[in-house]
Design a protein with these regions (language model features):
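Conserved histidine-centered catalytic loops in small-molecule metabolism enzymes
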Residues: 52-80, 84-90, 112-114, 193-211
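Acidic, low-complexity terminal tails and accessory targeting/binding regions
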Residues: 1-6, 49, 80, 94-106, ...
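Short active-site segment of divalent metal-dependent hydrolases/proteases
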Residues: 15, 161-162
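Short beta-strand scaffold positions
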Residues: 61-62, 137, 156-157
Length: 211
């Protein structure tokens, strides 16, 4: 995919639901924990060190409160105006349908295993929810609509959806049964930059909640 400029990508910091191992998806939202704010703070400091003096970024964010909270901390570090952020619904997390608000343990008590532990991805589709090809389609639409942008971008989003975005930007193959290009999982608190189909780590997170 021919994308101009660099795209810095991070998921939000740890939330109350992340800590409780409870599904959030695209609709439910909970605030960051102290760990989540610390992760955002560390990513912001790392990005400030990465950028050269005078370099600016376009700010793009999922409309979820947890993503916007994370971006507010990062934007302060790099001296950017959070109010100038573009809120982009296509950056939302995967829609987990009927699983939203339930713990992983509760769901597995009803259905058995729902995760492919090797890849850190769902092994079955959430009832009334999305699958990974749905995420890939909405993110492809966003990338194509914004392909004219030459400025560097900072994109704050979510665990599952960020893996699909990275997969698209890196030109990874579509994998079954997920029907989408999906990049490897990274610890929460990690930020990467993708340029010309190559990925570098800006800040390596040390948190859990791999996605």
């Amino acid at each position: 995919m021919n994308i101009k400029g660099r795209i810095f990508i991070a998921r939000h910091g740890e939330t109350v639901f992340n800590f409780a191992k409870r599904m959030q998806g695209d609709k439910l939202d909970t605030p960051l924990t102290r760990t989540g704010f610390a992760q955002a703070d560390a990513m912001g400091a790392a990005l400030a060190d990465w950028l050269k003096p005078g370099e600016t970024l376009q700010l793009w964010c999922s409309p979820s409160g947890r993503a916007l909270q994370t971006l507010a901390v990062i934007a302060e570090h790099i001296g950017h105006d959070w109010h100038q952020t573009t809120h982009e619904p296509r950056l939302y997390e995967i829609n987990v349908g009927d699983w939203a608000g339930r713990t992983y343990a509760e769901i597995m008590d009803d259905l058995g295993p729902i995760m492919d532990e090797t890849h850190g991805l769902f092994s079955i589709r959430p009832p009334k929810g999305e699958w990974y090809d749905d995420i890939a389609q909405r993110l492809t639409d966003w990338l194509e609509e914004t392909a004219h942008i030459s400025e560097d971008r900072l994109v704050i989003m979510h665990g599952m959806s960020s893996r699909v975005l990275r997969g698209l930007l890196l030109g990874l193959p579509v994998t079954e049964p997920w029907k989408a290009p999906i990049a490897p999982s990274l610890p929460q608190g990690t930020m990467v930059v993708v340029e010309n189909g190559q990925e570098q780590i800006v800040r390596q997170g040390g948190g859990g909640h791999l996605a």
